Curated annotation (Swiss-Prot):
Binding, GTP 2: 209-216, 256-260, 321-324
GO biological process, one term: ribosome biogenesis
Function according to Swiss-Prot or TrEMBL: GTPase that plays an essential role in the late steps of ribosome biogenesis.
Record's protein name: GTPase Der
Membership in a protein family: Belongs to the TRAFAC class TrmE-Era-EngA-EngB-Septin-like GTPase superfamily. EngA (Der) GTPase family.
Residues in EngA-type G domain copies: 3-167, 203-378
Disulfide links within the chain: none
Superkingdom of origin: Bacteria
Organism annotation: Rhizobium etli (strain ATCC 51251 / DSM 11541 / JCM 21823 / NBRC 15573 / CFN 42)
Length: 473
């Protein structure tokens, strides 16, 4: 992108609505409740021929530095310092407040270009608020309606004037790896090659877990900076925020998500939106790190989150966080491994790593587990190897006989990866018991080294050409 723009203003003036309008999709949560946005969220904006990086920020308020609102303010000020230009959004419908005046003074002291944006200008009675905005001393306000998309051409012109035409329209080459590409399903039936794993491809990783498990602290430790808002309060994160960083030459895009509580406890509309946003992050990710609080692990909600991730077909890694607070580490680790195997039978062999997001202990091992798990998630096995394996499995444990007739498994192939899925041609596929399917899945995990990922097997019986004749007679 040619330049970076921060959207700033007091709470509930429509900053996230404008952000969503500029990126062309609903990335930021929007609600009437003030203070929905807490972390700074970047996005790729397009506006009438302009392309730039846009940053949504928390509403600015006067607050003590150590309070939650104070830490939110620090995140917003960091975005202003990072940006080349600020869009200062005021509410033309409800008029100015003393907070607007204080923010205008703060932006003036920064000495960076500012575009004053009078949002909600479509509302009846907004003229008074629009003209009041002149008193802020930041030049002529640009009237817009972020909700209805009005005034976008004027906003484009104001940005170009503030940043300069040469800077506004500067071209920049975009590498292929900068483009988000959804997981592909272009693997063809019966393909007999086992392609090498691409260790240079950018990797999307979602960090999920219960509230206050230490997800944001973990990502901040990876980044080496206080990029995400953290604190003792549960439920600080609301939006799913993505950040990029480099690990040993590979681009990692991590998604911080809101803490996920049991559905029965989620009553507020805003929390429901946050959980839905976290679910979207899981579906977009390739590997999901499920963060447990090692001091109180394996709550019922932890198990449900693991089950959800596996049902979505994602590669999963368990991270037992707050390891710095554990005293008898060897005994606790042995207990955690026993409980993992017992309580998560559907995730047999899943990688589980003790870590401390606070101190950074164990993070290299966690990243290597993420890479190894993604390698398995992308794994392809040749048809020839699969059919030799299938023959051996049937010799060791033949399929059961149903009504005196033994089921025959004739042919096996991998139909897709991400996650690995297989098709087996057999007789009487509808009669094959679930226990035999589990036997085959466990065999695939053990013989082809495939822990930590969901494995799916589909059975198909060949069409019987005489079936229609039987029905006619």
């Amino acid at each position: 992108m040619s330049f970076t723009v921060a959207i700033v203003g007091r709470p509930n003036v429509g900053k996230s609505t404008l952000f969503n309008r500029l990126v062309g999709k609903k990335l930021a949560l929007v609600d009437d409740t003030p203070g929905v946005t807490r972390d700074r969220r970047p996005g790729d904006a397009r506006l009438m021929g302009l392309t730039f990086t846009i940053i949504d920020t928390a509403g600015l308020e006067e607050a003590d530095e150590e309070s939650l609102q104070g830490r939110m303010r620090a995140q917003t000020e960091a975005a202003i310092d990072e940006a080349d230009l600020s869009l200062f959004v005021v509410d033309a419908k409800n008029g100015l407040t003393p907070v607007d005046t204080a923010l205008a003074e703060m932006l003036r002291r920064r000495g960076k270009p500012v575009v004053l944006v009078a949002n909600k200008s479509e509302a009846r009675g907004s003229d008074s608020g629009f003209y009041d905005a002149y008193t802020l001393g930041l030049g002529e306000p640009t009237p817009i309606s972020a909700e209805h998309g009005q005034g976008m051409l004027d906003l484009r012109d104001a940005i170009v004037e503030a940043i300069g035409k040469d800077r506004a329209y500067a071209k920049e080459d975009v590498a292929v790896t900068d483009v988000d590409i959804p997981p592909s399903e272009n693997e063809a039936d019966g393909e007999d090659e086992e392609p090498a794993y691409d260790e240079t491809k950018p990797l999307r990783v979602a960090i999920v877990g219960r509230p206050n498990a230490g997800k944001s602290t973990l990502i901040n430790r990876f980044l080496g900076e206080d990029r995400l808002l953290t604190g003792p309060e549960a439920g600080i994160t609301r939006d799913s925020i993505s950040v990029e960083w480099d690990w040993r030459g590979r681009t990692i895009k991590m998604f911080d998500t809101a803490g996920m509580r049991r559905k029965a406890r989620v009553t507020e509309k805003l929390e429901k939106l946050s959980v839905a946003d976290a679910l979207r992050a899981i579906r977009f990710a390739e590997t999901v790190v499920i963060v447990f609080d090692a001091t109180i692990p394996f709550e019922k909600q932890d198990l449900q989150i693991v089950d959800l991730v596996l049902r979505e077909g994602r590669a999963a890694v368990l991270a037992f966080n707050k390891w710095d607070m554990i005293e008898d580490r060897q005994a606790v680790l042995a207990d955690l491994r026993e409980k993992t195997d017992r309580l998560l039978p559907q995730a047999r062999g899943i990688r589980a790593v003790p870590i401390s997001g606070q101190t950074g202990w164990g993070l290299d091992k966690l990243m290597q587990s993420i890479i190894d798990t993604d390698r398995v998630w992308n794994k392809r096995i040749s048809t020839a190897r699969l059919n030799r394996w299938l023959e051996t499995q049937q010799i060791q444990h033949p399929p059961p006989a149903v009504s005196g007739r033994r089921i025959k498994l004739k042919y096996m192939t991998q139909v897709k990866a991400r996650p690995p899925a297989f098709m087996i041609s057999c007789t009487r596929s509808d009669a094959l018991p679930e226990s035999y399917t589990r036997y085959l899945i466990n065999g695939l995990r053990a013989d082809f080294d495939m822990p930590s990922v969901p494995i799916r097997i589909h059975f198909r019986s060949p069409d019987n050409p005489f079936e229609s004749k039987k029905k006619r007679t």
